[in-house]
Amino acid sequence: MFEVNPVLNKLKELSERTELLRGYLDYDAKKERLEEVNAELEQPDVWNEPERAQALGKERVALENVVGTIDTLTQGADDVAMLVELAVEGEDEDTFNEAVAEADVLETKLVDLEFRRMFSGQHDPSDCYIDIQSGSGGTEAQDWANMVLRMYLRWGDAHGYKPELIECSEGDVAGIKSATIKFTGEYAFGWLRTETGVHRLVRKSPFDSGGRRHTSFCSVFVYPEIDDDIDIEINPADLRIDVYRASGAGGQHVNRTESAVRITHIPTGVVVQCQNDRSQHKNKDQCMKQLKAKLYELEIQKQNAEKQALEETKSDIGWGSQIRSYVLDDARIKDLRTGVETRNTQAVLDGDLDKFIEASLKSGL
């Protein structure tokens, strides 16, 4: 005799959760918008404006993810219920086991969609940048900044975000002083936005002949790439533009000409750099895009900080807030906001950050 009730109960719960998501995610409006986007992309002159066509293509993927998944879940629950009915009628154990497996697959899809619901911020679907800056502490801190850079590059590769090293300034002896990475892909900013803050390393330094324990800090700042139609006024008189010869690891790919660009926004002290192209003009354009995005995100964070101060919320989004502690001697990495920790330090340093990121998103940071 088959255990039918647990499967039917699961299907009922899946259907109820799917209906809730249908409302939360505004399924009807998204389906209507998807039809509009598809119609626009079918126009023969759509590629006369390549940037708009690319934006529409990106929007279509995001809409299809929601609409298609909800359609799959709705139809899938009906199909599995029918399989269960057929299995019971025919006393067919293989068909029943297939139905159980299909129900599990549907639940996985639903959990993934429920998780995506946390990406409700205006810029969560956007590409993003991560700025990494070593703290005080000389070579040890610069080596730590390089470890953090490697960690995020590995994470980006594993998640298909095509990480691109926009700028990297070598350390005096080892490691790096600073770096900027661009992540391209759906919900890049949504995934990474809670990584902003100070990351603290405690270990026996390989650069200390006495093998003493050192504490080093590294600042991480995540900001979304913003649309050109968002108006950020930047007065050219407020900018200091420097050109210099590129430095940093990269072998034959390092730009050896004096085309690297650094732009300082004097009123705020914000600095952006780009050295990944041989064209000074292209590097300057990239710097201006980063500056615009960074000033926008800083303004949003300032507004959020003021709002949170009024509401006395628990989370400090300030640049100086310490978010995670990496104590390598004790084999322990702990998120100071959520309490999540792991002893598999090497896996985390190799880019396995999902446990920490998911916990911070679920807690509404």
Swiss-Prot record:
A GO CC annotation given for this chain: cytoplasm
InterPro entries per UniProt: PCRF (IPR005139), Pep_chain_release_fac_I (IPR000352), Pep_chain_release_fac_I_sf (IPR045853), PrfB (IPR004374)
Pfam families recorded: PCRF, RF-1
Domain of life: Bacteria
Principal localisation: cytoplasm
Single GO molecular function: translation release factor activity, codon specific
Alphabetized Gene3D superfamilies for the sequence: 3.30.160.20, 3.30.70.1660, Release factor
Alphabetic keyword roster: Cytoplasm, Methylation, Protein biosynthesis
Post-translational modification comment from the UniProt entry: Methylated by PrmC. Methylation increases the termination efficiency of RF2.
Cellular localization per UniProt: Cytoplasm
Signal sequence segment: none
Residue numbers carrying N5-methylglutamine: 252
NCBIfam families in the cross-refs: prfB
Family the entry assigns: Belongs to the prokaryotic/mitochondrial release factor family.
Functional description taken from the UniProt entry: Peptide chain release factor 2 directs the termination of translation in response to the peptide chain termination codons UGA and UAA.
Protein name, entry field: Peptide chain release factor 2
Gene: prfB
